[in-house]
Amino acid sequence: MRNKIALIFGVSGQDGAYLADFLLKKKYKIIGITRNNSKSNLFRLKKLKIEKKIKIYQNKSLNSDFLKKIFNKNKIINEIYYLSGETSPLRSIKEPIQTFESNVISLIKILEFIKL
């Protein structure tokens, strides 16, 4: 039986990192999406010692070209987790439109893409 493949949007955040660790222990292959793949942003994955076990893609503005690239490179994706979005309450108040785009519009784009 083949290992299941999970795509995690927001893999470098707290919940994404813990989910990736959990799924790796269940023998999943993980594809992770993060807005920022700098070393300082991937510290949770590094602390869990799973950074090298995840195929990580960086993308700041989710669009159909990026989604096509991910799904073309990874023909079979069994599960998709959307844990991405603005996590700073102060920033969400200061930048409500950007927060809405990050938290809602990006998810809608993913759902529209996978329904095709």
Where are these regions (language model features)?
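N-terminal Rossmann-like NAD(P)+-binding domain of SDR-like oxidoreductases, especially those catalyzing
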Residues: 1-116
